[in-house]
Amino acid sequence: VYKRQAKERMVALVKNLQESLGERVKGLAWMGDSTKVKALEKLATFHVKIGYPDKWKDYSTLEIKDDSYWANMERTNEWNHAEMVAKAGKPVDKEEWLMTPQTVNAYYNPTTNEICFPAGILQYPFFDMNADDAFNYGAIGVVIGHEMTHGFDDQGRQYDKDGNLKDWWTDEDSKRFDERAQVMVNVFDSIEVAPGVHGNCRMTLGENI
């Protein structure tokens, strides 16, 4: 059962891990000062979503009938499509969630620079209100750190703090990042996942980072 106190505790966990990641960024010997400033700005402006949205999506115009599952799916898909098309030309709603609260997952969205942790994942074994911080840092803390890092992986680093597709790295720092990423690519590509079949780290680099 999701409790309000879970959000309060998650807010504290996220804040502490933001600060910790910030210290790691400051200590990077290979990253220049100008890129560090931009990275820290992006980290500090993460839009954090926890539990469930403050504004629920209005489904009042969606018709669910007892005719057939297929027909209900058709109507639902049509409704979703119409809702998406209606957003064209309008300001981006940064309060909109891309996952339902009951989803056991989390995400980082580079176009809004947000990290989201639905109520569904705030339960054992990822999170336990009755456990001490050590347990939760070792469980949900891994998920929090994972999503934060997506903001600076091979894909996320291409977006700025406002979610714009904009290069905020110096050429030298970008080159150094690619050199370090290539080391990881080489390691994962050398893994034989099945007889005669090797991994393709370029396809999974963001997750591997």
Model-derived regions, located:
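Active-site loops and adjacent core secondary-structure elements that bind or stabilize anionic groups
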Residues: 1
